[in-house]
Amino acid sequence: MKPDAHQVKQFLLNLQDTICQQLTAVDGAEFVEDSWQREAGGGGRSRVLRNDGVFEQAGVNFSHVHGEAMPASATAHRPELAGRSFEAMGVSLVVHPHNPYVPTSHANVRFFIAEKPGAEPVWWFGGGFDLTPFYGFEEDAIHWHRTARDLCLPFGEDVYPRYKKWCDDYFYLKHRNEQRGIGGLFFDDLNTPDFDHCFAFMQAVGKGYTDAYLPIVERRKAMAYGERERNFQLYRRGRYVEFNLVWDRGTLFGLQTGGRTESILMSMPPLVRWEYDYQPKDGSPEAALSEFIKVRDWV
């Protein structure tokens, strides 16, 4: 089937609505919407929830941009895209909870299509979701990865292991020699065997995110915590900022295409701290995190 960008866009708009409704049901607060237009072509809907409830900040962004030439961040690993016009659309979200026992989560699903006269379109899907705990709970990690594995199974037994490894490899801070979190799924450049198959997989990932995340939120949101746990959460959020500004391809793509800076940087935590040469106390729950986030098979 020929790629249908309109069909993908409608799914993404509905997905944004659904995820916002589900997060509001947990938190009680409403998202504030900010619709924007991109001067060079396209626009989007940025939605942000900020309050003193379960989520300190949650951002769920839809964007649909188009232009006459692909940016350097995209053509660097796909030189055949040079000289083509493009459309890029997606839903990207990050949830930063108040409670340090509730992990931060990130999800993204996206579609690219690049065209030029007299040539077949070049298109692909990408996306995934990943979890960044501050305090590790094995049952949460197992649930997260089991949900990821189960949504992948209808598409092939090799899909989950392949995209889990890609996630582990991608969300890695080289300058710290550590993972950003416990991973999940990451895929990109997906265009085989055909459009319908790839679109169905992208939909499964988009819908699977809340199945993976919300049960963990419900399990941890009422746990008691104090200043020590909060300070550690803010310190570890620094890793999130470092990854997004130094390594993340999506951030680079958005900035290089003249995307809306407020929406691109919506993933940043509202509060964060750095501490020079911080060393957690031996045997403490904080010290245990470095082992917990090391790559392993959770299911």
From Swiss-Prot:
It is an enzyme of class 1 (oxidoreductase). The keyword tRNA processing does not apply. Pfam families: Coprogen_oxidas. The active site is at H106. One of its GO terms (cellular component) is cytoplasm. One of its GO terms (biological process) is protoporphyrinogen IX biosynthetic process. The gene is hemF. It comes from the Bacteria. This is Oxygen-dependent coproporphyrinogen-III oxidase. The keyword Oxidoreductase applies. Its EC number is 1.3.3.3.
